[in-house]
């Protein structure tokens, strides 16, 4: 399945504010460029794998919640919202982490642009992606790869 879309209008729509030209949305990579460097592609593929991790965790969580509610005979239409949990869990985690970091850093830096840049760079998911994006240059036996939820280890580094 095609996962990278070049010269994408979707990328232009979502990246016009940030200054970036490539974005990963719902497990697909969209870019304004005609081609991507291996470094940028590796960075975005780490985000793809993080999205897949969160999707699987969200699916498991939604199933557990659904069976628990059925066990107690609690059923209503709002349970259909649980279908959205796997799809949006990555963005919920990423956004929550970013907002907490941004608020903290806006008090620390007193300058919103610096707080924004600092909050973005100190995101655990971004830290893992930046850490692994150069691994493609190493010989195969020396490469580190993404492991499920390995980005949790970056919470102690922030």
Question: Where would I find each of the regions flagged by the language model?
Answer:
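Catalytic Zn2+-binding segment of zinc metalloproteases
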Residues: 45-61
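Short pre-active-site segment immediately N-terminal to the catalytic Zn-binding motif
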Residues: 16-42, 52
């Amino acid at each position: 399945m095609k996962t990278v879309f070049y010269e994408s209008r979707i990328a232009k729509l979502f990246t016009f504010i940030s200054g970036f030209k490539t974005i990963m949305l719902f497990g697909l990579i969209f870019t304004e460029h005609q081609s991507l460097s291996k470094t940028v592609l590796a960075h975005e593929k780490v985000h793809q794998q993080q999205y897949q991790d969160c999707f699987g965790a969200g699916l498991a969580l939604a199933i557990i919640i659904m069976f628990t509610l059925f066990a107690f005979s609690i059923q209503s239409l709002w349970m259909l919202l649980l279908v959205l949990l796997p799809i949006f869990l990555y963005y919920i985690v990423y956004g929550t982490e970013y907002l907490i970091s941004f608020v903290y850093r806006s008090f620390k830096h007193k300058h919103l642009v610096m707080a924004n840049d600092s909050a973005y760079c100190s995101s655990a998911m971004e830290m893992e992606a930046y850490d692994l994006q150069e691994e493609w240059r190493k010989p195969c036996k020396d490469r580190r790869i993404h492991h499920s939820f390995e980005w949790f280890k970056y919470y102690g580094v922030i």
